[in-house]
Amino acid sequence: DCCGVKLEMCHPCLCDNSCKKSGK
């Protein structure tokens, strides 16, 4: 799990804009 989304969706796993847009 990465920032609320699966690792596959958030490769960087930095909880940044990309992660927040895909997850929470």
From Swiss-Prot:
S-S bonds: 2-10, 3-15, 13-19
Chief localization: secreted
Transmembrane segments: none
Subcellular location as annotated: Secreted
Gene Ontology cellular-component annotations: extracellular region
Chain positions with Lysine amide modification: 24
Source species, domain of life: Eukaryota
GO molecular function terms noted in the UniProt entry: ion channel regulator activity; toxin activity
Alphabetical keyword list: Amidation, Disulfide bond, Ion channel impairing toxin, Neurotoxin, Secreted, Toxin
Tissue: Expressed by the venom duct.
UniProt family annotation: Belongs to the conotoxin A superfamily.
Domain notes: The cysteine framework is IV (CC-C-C-C-C).
Functional description taken from the UniProt entry: Probable neurotoxin with ion channel inhibitor activity. In vivo, elicits dose-dependently excitatory activity upon injection into fish. Its action is slowly reversible.
Protein name in the entry: Conotoxin PIVF
Native organism: Conus purpurascens
